[in-house]
Amino acid sequence: IFAAWPQLYAVSFSGFYLAMAAVLLALILRPVGFKYRSKRDSSQWRAAWDWALFVGGFVPALIFGVAMGNVLQGVPFRIQPDMQIFYEGGFFGLLNPFALLCGLVSVAMLVMHGAAWLVLKTDGLVASRARNWGIRAALATVVLYAVAGVLLWNVVDGYRITSALVTTGPSNPLFKTVQSGVAGTWFANYAAHPWTQLAPAAG
């Protein structure tokens, strides 16, 4: 994706740098946690590494959802005439209410997915606990997903390209005009292409 659209690479890595660094550190923490959790016969030691494993799984799931929420709202950047891109936001600006809601949707969906996998691969107490958490995560996913959809329809401003799409030449964002400031714009695609409604309906 980044090779096809280098502008996307430039904006995302400059704007989401701290967020991506947090994801990277969390992903590094997971294999370390699995390796060192059983190194000592101590309940406190194991509990500490259990929390490390939790952080290593929770942070990437949350931040990936937060990133998607910010993409839906629009990322604050500007493009110079010489095609230089400047990000004008900050890390804490990414943690806005709608983006955090999208982060929670991501966490709930991944917990549901992980719980379903454990139910299939284990039995006994582990499978029973995974089933209980999977049901809770599924209910949370449905509720949070619905709330996010209502906000996208009524509150969050969408974006729509109003200029002609030239598919026979190189991409130049300076030649495009975008309409924003109208809530529900993201749902216009469902009206233009009704078959796309199958995607959210199928989950």
Protein language model regions, located:
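Long, contiguous internal "core" modules enriched in hydrophobic/ aromatic residues
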Residues: Y36-G203
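Membrane helical hairpin/interfacial module
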Residues: I1-Y36
